[in-house]
A protein has these predicted regions:
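Core segments of cupin and vicinal oxygen chelate
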Residues: 8-63
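Acidic/polar active-site rim loop that often engages polyanionic ligands
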Residues: 81
Length: 158
């Protein structure tokens, strides 16, 4: 089974927006991560203002759908490119296949690789200029199949 979830990118007000969505849809955040929690990347420095911004946030709005988002960091979100689709596959092989097909004729912005947050993950923009985040997480699959584990696939912004 594949699952597609909306991913929203904000110009610094993600936390405010998601608190609003939480008031509308109810529920609790299953993940809130800030840029200050990322491993430091060589040649990249976070400003004090960026450290507290949202790297990733997740709000389940139904049994099947998780509203996800982040603040912009390395690119500027504009209306139109501030929404991406996050697809979680049920195997690493399917993640590779989906990523290859979606990025064909488009832009492979982050190749598929194992991430520090646990997902096998990549980002691309397809030939129709749609932003995609492709991931596979074995623990997330167990959760979807009824396991007691409370681990969620986490995606980062495009």
């Amino acid at each position: 089974m594949r699952v597609i979830n909306p991913y929203l990118t904000f110009p610094g007000n993600c936390e405010e927006a998601f608190n609003f969505y939480k008031s509308v849809f109810g529920g609790e955040f299953t993940y809130v991560g800030r840029f200050s929690e990322m491993p430091q990347q060589e040649g990249k420095t976070l400003s004090d203002a960026d450290k507290n911004k949202i790297m990733h946030i997740s709000l389940p709005i139904s049994k099947e759908t998780i509203l996800m988002g982040s603040d912009e960091w390395e690119y500027r979100a504009n209306y139109g490119n501030n929404i991406g689709l996050s697809i979680t596959t049920d195997s690493k092989e399917d993640a590779d296949r989906v990523y290859q097909e979606l990025s064909g004729g488009g832009v492979a912005s982050m190749p598929m690789s194992q991430t520090f947050w646990g997902d096998y993950f990549g980002m691309c923009t397809d030939r129709f200029n749609v932003n995609w985040m492709v991931s596979y997480n074995e623990n997330w699959i167990s959760q979807m199949n009824g396991s007691d584990q409370k681990v969620e696939s986490q995606s980062m912004a495009v």
